[in-house]
Amino acid sequence: MSILIAFALAVLRLTGFFIEPRLSDADIHAVSGEPARVMWPLSTERPLTVVTWNIERGARFDRVAAMLGEVDADVILLQEADRFCSRSGDRDVARDLAIQLQMNYVIAGEFQEVGEGRRDQPCVSGQAILSRMPIEDAIAVRFADQASLKWRLNPAQPRRGGRIALRARTGGTVFYSVHLESGADETLRAKQVGDILSDVPAGREPVIIGGDFNNVGGPASPMFAGLRAAGFGNAMIDTASERPMARRPIDWIFTRHIIARAEVIRAADASDHDPIVATASVQRRF
């Protein structure tokens, strides 16, 4: 039965492959959303709760929404958020989460997943930022170095576009929702981190970088050296043991000019990644 289901899904995607229009990279990476739909009365003295989570396309939407509702975050950084893809119920996942959680949101596509959309609505998956506060200055940072994989020719996952980080400003803090390349080595991922650091504003403005880094080297990864040199601290380090809190972690939160401590929340039934929840407060003395 599973073979028949897999065959049927392959036929459906192949059909979509021939009818779905191809988007340009500019269209795929374009930022959209509702950045100022709501405004929560938040105190400036209250610590900020930030979540980063690769939601595996949002295919298990109800479970993802329930988990985020329990966490009650002020800012949410999402990776692999689908828009109008058959594999995730043709939802605009970030928009639907923002509505359900009563938050503002912006999203930028990473890849067009060819064959998962429709003739009138191509499927795009990418990074999103949700916030209880208005969102400003949102842009997609497309990495200069991409994997050498020929995604457009991959019969198992035909796609267009390239890896990006989504940057936005909300609540007086600059956020990056990051998804680094999985089909490459640590050297390429370190270069992608360098692209993010080149985009980080100069000065004392608080910055939080969170997401799926796809690293295999743990704290020894070359990308960490660049982040440390740029003044970023790793919120995922347990200061009591100085060891990463998650075993073999690939999801991280890094901060500059803001103090944060993060923990992993188990959510195996909602995604193939667990969400990371950080409590952050702005440094008063620089």
Where are these regions (language model features)?
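Short, flexible, glycine-rich and Lys/Arg-enriched loop motifs at helix boundaries
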Residues: 88-89
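Active-site regions of metal-assisted phosphoester/phosphodiester hydrolases
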Residues: 1-75, 83-84, 99, 104-286
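Active-site phosphate/pyrophosphate- and oxyanion-stabilizing loops and adjacent acidic/basic residues
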Residues: 95
